[in-house]
């Protein structure tokens, strides 16, 4: 097994001991580590070569044989299959129903040039008015669960409890929950999916200030209080790694901050420090919220966790330094937020390389952080190669040089791509990577219960390779889902505790800085025909996979007062309820 300690030793890689790395990083770890962890101090470990080599012929060969195509009965009856979405990406009604403005409202309206197609989410998929159609699609496809997010400024328009609760927003989510439950669909709620109340950005720069911890905890408590009788599965934060890096490092996402001289909406930030400050405050808000939930709202059957965005990593070349770069890529991508919840502090490599720019936890904060999850959510799409880079005075320090590895290449040192190109520029299909990540969670992080909370690929409007002629014909998505479900099954057979899979996404939506150019939905949204929902071939395959027959669905939906045919017709004809 490769040891990170050896990569950071005085004799092996002096480039790591640069001005960026702290001179006494191991002592820093001892000062900050949770007492229960000090007796267990170890270097970070990779998967053993034997474990990494356990690749099935199904994942190696690319296309699955007919007998390798996954089936529902491969998985335990209690294994959940669902689809996912996010409030900002689908709801629309950006200034209706008492909702306050969000950071993304501000970003899209004031910096439209930062969205590739110049669009915004003002209407999005119109789900605020057409949520019953979304539930109908879930039911018809046979999904047993739905992961969606609550818009913080729709609940607290000013971002704070003192600013008042918006009861129209409470009613909207209660109506959605009632509709889901009536149709036998379990809700999984994400409390924060990147749409920070703009009022908090104006008041104190939102997640850059510790006051966010109290305000977020207050917001989460309002949600527990009003929806807790209907919701047993909670997620505090979605993809903190992406949130910190894209919103406060590169500025590609709202609020759009980056360092002076960089190309972003607001080049008045500090890309070397602010992402770590935001991540630290986010972890503190998570810990406080979980503490409140477990003390007052969890009961016997509730559970709460955080969702991590992960990539799989392979060494760029067959050499020691690239293998260590692979280690660091895992630390900086997954360990940044998971290790504080497992052992009470950031990974040793981060303490070493980021130095005093990485905040410290107090003892009481560590005590709340450790074991502050009942499950871990994993969003997995693709993989990269990790290549070591030397840290030297000639390199201009920035967020993506802190980790001393580079992952811009889709190809390895021999020019071999990590997987097939699916048309979406950043997604190359690599199902083996999902299996490897799940086994890594088992061997390195104590095998926590895991839900695959996002997994899917996108169609590209005008960017496809080759371009799509029929938006409903998505064979690459079907193949992608089949291969990744097979990878999950193989990881389960090797002992990984995986409990569910959510396809991203249920419907085509507003895809952040890409606007509407990329379509991740298994259901097509016809924006020229009243936002009509139409199942793609992938949805029809999932319907068959789930064993949902047309006769059963029609019978159930026909009896549903929530999603009756008359209501559906009215909503399609009158999307704004007029």
From Swiss-Prot:
Coiled coil: none annotated. GO terms for cellular component: chloroplast stroma. Residues 1-57 form a transit peptide. It holds the Pfam family Glyco_hydro_1. The keyword Mitochondrion does not apply. It is found in: Plastid, Chloroplast stroma. A beta-D-glucoside binds at residues 89, 193, 238-239, 381, 454, 504, 511-512, 520. It comes from the Eukaryota. Belongs to the glycosyl hydrolase 1 family. Beta-glucosidase acting as a preformed defense system. Hydrolyzes the bisdesmosides avenacosides A and B to 26-desgluco-avenacosides exhibiting fungicidal activity. Can use beta-fucoside > beta-glucoside > beta-galactoside > beta-xyloside as substrates, but not alpha-glycosides, beta-thioglucosides and disaccharides. This is Avenacosidase 2. It comes from Avena sativa (Oat). The lineage of its organism: Eukaryota, Viridiplantae, Streptophyta, Embryophyta, Tracheophyta. The gene is P60B.
């Amino acid at each position: 097994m490769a040891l990170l300690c050896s990569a950071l030793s005085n004799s092996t890689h002096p480039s790591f001991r640069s001005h960026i790395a702290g001179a006494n990083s191991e002592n820093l770890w001892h000062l900050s580590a949770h007492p229960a962890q000090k007796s267990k101090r170890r270097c970070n470990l990779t998967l053993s070569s034997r474990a990494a080599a356990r690749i099935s012929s199904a994942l190696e060969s690319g296309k699955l044989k007919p007998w390798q195509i996954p089936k529902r009965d491969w998985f335990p009856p209690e294994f959940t299959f669902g689809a996912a979405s996010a409030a900002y990406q689908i709801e629309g009604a950006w200034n209706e129903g008492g909702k306050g403005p969000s950071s993304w409202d501000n970003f899209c309206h004031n910096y439209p040039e930062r969205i590739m197609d110049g669009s915004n989410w003002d209407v999005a998929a119109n789900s605020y008015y057409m949520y019953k159609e979304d539930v109908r699609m879930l039911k018809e496809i046979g999904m047993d669960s739905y992961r969606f997010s609550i818009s913080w400024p729709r609940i607290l328009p000013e971002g704070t409890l003192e600013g008042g609760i918006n009861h129209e927003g409470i009613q909207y989510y209660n109506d959605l929950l009632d509709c889901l439950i009536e149709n036998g669909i379990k809700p999984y709620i994400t409390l924060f999916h990147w749409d920070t109340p703009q009022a908090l950005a104006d008041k104190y720069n939102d997640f850059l200030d510790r006051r966010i911890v109290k305000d977020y905890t207050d917001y989460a408590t309002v949600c527990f209080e009003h929806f807790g009788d209907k919701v047993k599965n909670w997620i505090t934060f979605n993809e903190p790694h992406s949130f910190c890096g894209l919103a406060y490092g590169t500025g590609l996402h709202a609020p759009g901050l980056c360092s002076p001289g960089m190309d972003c909406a607001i080049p008045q930030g500090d890309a070397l420090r602010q992402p770590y400050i935001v991540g630290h405050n986010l972890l503190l808000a998570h810990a406080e919220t979980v503490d409140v939930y477990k003390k007052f709202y969890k009961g016997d059957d509730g559970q709460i966790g955080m969702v991590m965005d992960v990539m799989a990593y392979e060494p760029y070349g067959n050499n020691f330094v690239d293998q260590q770069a692979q280690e660091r890529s895992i630390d900086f991508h997954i360990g940044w937020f998971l290790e504080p919840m497992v052992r009470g502090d950031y990974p040793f490599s981060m303490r070493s390389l980021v130095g005093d720019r990485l905040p410290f936890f107090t003892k009481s904060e560590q005590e709340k952080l450790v074991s502050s999850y009942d499950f871990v959510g994993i969003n997995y799409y693709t993989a990269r190669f990790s290549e070591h880079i030397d840290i030297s005075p000639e390199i201009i320090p920035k967020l993506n040089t802190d980790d001393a590895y580079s992952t811009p290449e889709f190809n390895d040192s021999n020019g071999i791509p990590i997987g097939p190109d699916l048309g979406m520029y950043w997604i190359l299909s690599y199902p083996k990577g999902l299996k490897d990540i799940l086994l890594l969670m088992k061997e390195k992080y104590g095998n926590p219960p895991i839900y695959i909370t996002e997994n899917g690929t996108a169609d590209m409007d005008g960017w496809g390779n080759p371009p799509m002629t029929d938006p409903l014909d998505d064979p690459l998505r079907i193949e992608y889902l089949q291969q990744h479900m097979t990878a999950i099954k193989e990881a389960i057979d090797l002992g990984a505790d995986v409990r569910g899979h959510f396809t991203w996404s249920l419907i085509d939506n507003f895809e952040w800085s890409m606007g509407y150019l990329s379509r991740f939905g298994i259901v097509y949204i016809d924006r020229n025909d009243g936002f009509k929902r139409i199942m793609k071939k992938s949805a029809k395959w999932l319907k068959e996979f789930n064993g949902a027959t047309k006769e059963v669905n029609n019978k159930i939906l026909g009896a549903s007062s929530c999603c009756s045919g008359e209501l559906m017709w009215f909503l399609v004809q009158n999307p704004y309820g007029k």
